[in-house]
Regions:
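Aromatic (often tryptophan-rich) hydrophobic motifs at membrane interfaces
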Residues: 200-289
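Acyltransferase donor/substrate-recognition loop-hinge adjacent to the catalytic core
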Residues: 104-176
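Short, extreme N-terminal leader segments that mark the start of a protein/domain
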Residues: 1-19, 233, 284, 290
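Short, glycine/charge-rich beta-strand/loop segments that flank catalytic centers
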Residues: 85-101, 112-116
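Intrinsically disordered, low-complexity, positively charged segments
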Residues: 8-36
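Conserved donor-binding loop and adjoining core beta-sheet/short helix segment
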Residues: 26-94, 205-233
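Short catalytic-loop micro-motif centered on adjacent basic/acidic residues
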Residues: 88, 152, 256-259
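Short, conserved active-site entrance elements at the starts or edges of catalytic domains
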Residues: 157-209
């Protein structure tokens, strides 16, 4: 019933996701495609709903909320298939729907580590006011030191160069962090299949050399979803410039930027909070009692 996710499933995702407003980063096709190296991600259509199943090594699978008109019927089928059925990354509305329609069936918990951070695109481009003072200083330092910088869209012509830069920075980091190793594999997968995905990306050059890059996609009619942002750590302001330039050049017609979760990592949480999110999308987990 379930199939391991491949590029061939992109149209299937598009068919279901386009029928309703998606706000979570988790269920984007690009997000699933990027992170398939970190866990087994499988998909199926059950009761005319898209079902995404995720399994980490040596763990039981979990599911995202079914995407489609017959979500409750789909949940009933999943309860038959899976003992102690587990859902992750439920919105408050989805959690309440399960609680109200499957009374006493599930136990629920709030998972702060998975909350999506959502920012004002207008604010991140302008960086005005006291709350952005440090970020603006970093940006101004970059603009002063590298006034000749060039922004380019990621394209078939330069994606190989982006991949080479990404790989070089990864090797220089000498990391043994499995999350970063899998992220690196995911970046490679996205760049190698760039034209087939609905992503918009950009890079910044200084004296012809790539110093930062980022890519994301349109999530819904008001929001962008930023998947990846990478920069040279020895160049002050390299992260701030690509953050600003990607939003300015690719997503300025939208209102919000979803920059995904912090995974409970203290440094990542500090970094994400320092950009002053306008709100967080809370996520919940559910486990069936059977």
């Amino acid at each position: 019933m379930f199939e391991k996710i491949t590029l061939a499933h992109k149209d299937l995702f598009s068919r279901f996701l386009s029928a309703q407003k998606i706000v979570l980063s988790d269920v984007s096709f690009t997000n699933c495609f990027l992170w398939q190296h970190a866990r087994l991600i499988q998909v199926a259509v059950i009761r005319d709903c898209l079902v995404i199943q995720t399994t980490y090594k040596n763990q039981k699978p979990f599911y995202f909320y079914p995407i489609g008109k017959n979500a409750f019927e789909c949940v009933e089928e999943l309860l038959k298939l899976e003992k102690n059925l587990r859902f992750h990354s439920l919105t408050l509305e989805q959690k309440d729907d399960l609680k109200d329609n499957f009374v006493g069936v599930f136990d629920f918990t709030y998972n702060r580590d998975r909350s999506d951070y959502v920012y004002s695109i207008e604010e991140l481009i302008a960086l005005k006011g006291k709350k952005y003072h440090k970020k603006k200083n970093h940006l101004n330092q970059f603009l002063t030191n590298y006034a000749n910088f060039v922004y380019e869209k990621i394209s078939p012509q330069n994606k190989k160069e982006v991949l080479e830069a990404s790989q070089a920075w990864f090797l220089e980091s000498q990391t043994d962090d499995i999350g970063l190793i899998n992220e690196n594999k995911g970046i490679q997968s996205v760049l190698e299949n760039y034209e087939s995905l609905d992503v918009k990306g950009g890079l910044v050059r200084v004296n012809g050399e790539i110093v930062s890059f980022s890519f994301g996609e349109v999530l819904n009619e008001e929001s962008a979803l930023i998947h990846i942002e990478k920069a040279r750590t020895d160049i002050a302001g390299a992260y701030q410039i690509i953050n600003q330039q990607l939003l300015l050049n690719e997503f300025s017609h939208l209102t919000y930027a979803n920059r995904e979760e912090d995974l409970g990592l203290e440094g990542l949480r500090r970094s994400k909070m320092s950009y002053n999110p306008v709100f967080l999308i809370d996520k919940y987990e559910a486990i069936a009692r059977n």
